[in-house]
Swiss-Prot record:
Alphabetic keyword roster: Carbohydrate metabolism, Cellulose degradation, Disulfide bond, Glycoprotein, Glycosidase, Hydrolase, Polysaccharide degradation, Secreted, Signal
This protein's name: Probable 1,4-beta-D-glucan cellobiohydrolase B
Taxonomic lineage: Eukaryota, Fungi, Dikarya, Ascomycota, Pezizomycotina
The organism of origin for this protein: Aspergillus niger (strain ATCC MYA-4892 / CBS 513.88 / FGSC A1513)
GO molecular function: cellulose 1,4-beta-cellobiosidase activity; cellulose binding
EC number: 3.2.1.91
Residues the record marks as active site: E233 (nucleophile), E238 (proton donor)
Region annotation Ser/Thr-rich linker: where it falls in the sequence: 459-500
Amino acid sequence: MSSFQVYRAALLLSILATANAQQVGTYTTETHPSLTWQTCTSDGSCTTNDGEVVIDANWRWVHSTSSATNCYTGNEWDTSICTDDVTCAANCALDGATYEATYGVTTSGSELRLNFVTQGSSKNIGSRLYLMSDDSNYELFKLLGQEFTFDVDVSNLPCGLNGALYFVAMDADGGTSEYSGNKAGAKYGTGYCDSQCPRDLKFINGEANCDGWEPSSNNVNTGVGDHGSCCAEMDVWEANSISNAFTAHPCDSVSQTMCDGDSCGGTYSASGDRYSGTCDPDGCDYNPYRLGNTDFYGPGLTVDTNSPFTVVTQFITDDGTSSGTLTEIKRLYVQNGEVIANGASTYSSVNGSSITSAFCESEKTLFGDENVFDKHGGLEGMGEAMAKGMVLVLSLWDDYAADMLWLDSDYPVNSSASTPGVARGTCSTDSGVPATVEAESPNAYVTYSNIKFGPIGSTYSSGSSSGSGSSSSSSSTTTKATSTTLKTTSTTSSGSSSTSAAQAYGQCGGQGWTGPTTCVSGYTCTYENAYYSQCL
C-alpha cells in the first residue's frame, strides 16, 4: 500500500520531556478518541468493547526536546538536530494530537469519521489510525477461522481516494519492549509497517529515518529514508465510491522487520527493485471490476455506493478452527436487509468469488502478473501472520505514487483497457492526481462503524444498522442477536426467517457444529471442508 500524506506546519510551543531516546512532548496531552466495537460468539451474542483509536506517529509534530524547534519541516530534517538516526531519536519528541481540529478525526459510539482535508492552524491531508485495547497497546486480532464485519459509507469518496481498512503485523506495544530507543510507543502511534516496506516513515525501530533522507520530488511534505518497515498486510477493504478490492500480502517473516535501501522493494524503491524485498507488494487481490464484473459495485449498482452497507470478510481454514491453515478469504455484503454474495469473476479461466490458492494462481496467469504471492508464502504465509495477531488500521489517503489508478481506473495506463486485468474501474486515467483531488474534493470523507468480530456466521446477521454509528452499551454489556430476514440478489428466492434453519451464507455443518444443519429457502448447505459447511 502507498503511504499517506500530511500537510502540517507546526507552530506550537511546548514543555518537553528529556531523556536519551525518542521522546514524548508534553505541550498537548494525548487523549485517544473512544470507539466501541463488538466481539460475537457462535450463538449470536455480541459483547460491546470500549476501545479507542490513535493517529500514526508520522502525522505528529516532531520537535526538539530542548526547544520548540521543529526536527522536521516540510519534507526535510533539521540536520543541526538530526545528524544521524540515533542522535535524532534522542534529540526529538513526538507530541500529542488534537484529533478533530488538526486531523479531521471524530468518533461517536461505534462510528469513526475521517475527513480528507482539514484546515486548522495548518493543512492536513488524510489520516491513518489504529484501534487500541488500552491506552498503551494496540488491539490484536487473530483472524483465522473468524469473521470481521463493519459498516462503511463511501458515498463521499470520489476517484483518486482510498478509504482503507486493513490489518498489519505491527507490535502490540508499538515497539517499546523490543527497541529501547522507542519511548513513545503505541500511545503515540509508533511501529507502523506494511507489505510495501514503507521508507517514508520518520521513525523505525526506535530510531529516526533521517540517514540518506531524500525529499520527495512531487510532495512538499514527504521523503524517503535509508530504511523501511516491513510486515504482512491483509487489506480487508480498499475502496472509494467507484471501485473496491481486498488483497492478501504475505511476507517472509510473521513479525515486523527493518530493511535497507532499494532492497526493501515495494513502492518506495527503484522500479527494477519492486520485488527484491521480503514481502509481496502486489498481493493476491480481488477487485470485481478487474475480474470483469463491471455492474456489481458502484453508484446505483448491486452494492450501491450511494448508501452505507455492511462488509463481511471470512477467514476460512482447512479444519474450521482458529489453529488451522488459511485456505480461503470470502466476502459478503449486507445492504437494506439483503445479504449479497460477492461479485464473481466473469473469466472462465478464473473461477469463484473468493481468494483461494487456485484463484490466485489462475488470476496471476490470466493477467500476466508475476506470482510474487507464492514466493512469499501465499495464503499459508498470510495465515501465519494472522495466527500471531494483527493490528487494525483505519485510514483515508490519496496516492502520490500512482494516482490510485491501480484501484479505480485503467492500469498500467500504457496498456489496452481490453487486456484482462488492466481495467479496474470507470475513473479516467487522468484522475487521481493528488493536487487536483485535494483542491476539488476537500470535503470528502469516509465513515467506518459497527465493527464486529467473531466466529464465521456470528456477526452480520446480528441486526447491525448500517451507518448508525451509535452504541449504548458498555464493555460489560452483552446483547443477543436476533434473527432477521436476509435476501440476496444472486437468487430469485427471497429466503425466509427461521430460527431452525441457518441464514443465507451462515454455517450449517462441520465437525463439532451444534447449530442448524438446514438452510433457509433458496439456499443449500454446501460442504467446504470437514469442519465447515455453508448455506450458499
